[in-house]
Design a protein with these regions (language model features):
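Bacterial Sec-dependent N-terminal signal peptides
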Residues: 1-23
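N-terminal leader/targeting segments and the immediate start of mature chains
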Residues: 15-59, 72-73, 202, 207-212
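Extracytoplasmic
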Residues: 41-43, 62-64, 71, 85, ...
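Beta-turn initiation residues at beta-strand->coil junctions
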Residues: 52, 81, 94-95, 170-173
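An acidic-aromatic
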Residues: 64-112, 179
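Flexible, surface-exposed loop/linker segments and immediately adjacent secondary-structure boundaries
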Residues: 105-135
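Gly/Pro-enriched, hydrophobic low-complexity segments
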Residues: 126, 135-212
Length: 212
């Protein structure tokens, strides 16, 4: 599940660093609509671009990815690897190395990062602020409730309010690194549960490492 730490996921009334900041009710209304629109889809297919930049270190990388989500099940293709999960286990498929790693998802861990809660990671742990708006595109700034516990300063969401969808997520790191997810396509998907079941016969020449 570490891949989703890239792929970054009520409000405190008394904070030290942000003691004078309160969440914007208007921002919460918009985010609630995004959550409702996402929950209304039985399955979702997302095509995205991930960008990592750090001008101080002269770093500029980008990768394309695809993610299909159905409840807690998902299929991911990103950064030269694939992942598959049935909601209880996750298979990481390293095609170049002909290796497959199997890990168990800790369902009792409230902080476990899964695709279903990744799309709504902003619901807890943040203060919300409205920023610029151009047409239907609204920027909402997320400030962490506990800044000392995270390695970033803030997250900016770009939301298309006409369809209640996130179009862009940008994280500003404390080390001057910026991580950005650009959503190129976000649409309902029709997919059977069988698509999320790992079939060992499809990978006869692969080494399987069971970490459960």
């Amino acid at each position: 599940m570490k891949i989703f730490l890239l792929v970054v996921s009520l409000f405190a009334t008394q904070l030290s660093t942000f003691a004078q900041i309160t969440s914007s009710p208007e921002a919460k209304v918009i985010l609630d609509k995004v959550s409702a629109a996402t929950d209304a889809m039985e399955a979702i297919h997302i095509v995205f671009e991930y960008k990592l930049t750090n001008k101080e270190e002269n770093i500029s990388d980008s990768s394309m990815g695809e993610l299909t989500i159905k409840k807690d099940q998902y299929l991911l293709s990103f950064m030269r690897l694939s992942q598959m999960s049935d909601g209880e286990n996750v298979w990481t498929i390293l095609t170049d190395d002909e290796e497959i790693q199997i890990a168990e998802i800790d369902l009792e861990d409230e902080n476990a990062l899964t695709p279903s809660n990744l799309l709504k990671m902003y619901e807890t742990g943040f203060m919300y602020q409205l920023q610029d708006k151009v047409g239907n595109l609204q920027i909402i700034e997320l400030l962490p409730e506990n800044p000392a516990d995270v390695d970033y300063i803030k997250i900016e969401l770009l939301i298309d309010t006409s369809v209640n969808q996130i179009k862009n997520l940008k994280q500003f790191g404390k080390n001057a690194t910026e991580s950005e997810y650009i959503i190129n396509n976000f649409a309902p998907s029709i997919i059977s549960d069988e698509a999320f079941i790992f079939k060992e016969t499809d990978y006869v020449d692969f080494e399987i490492i069971d970490l459960r």
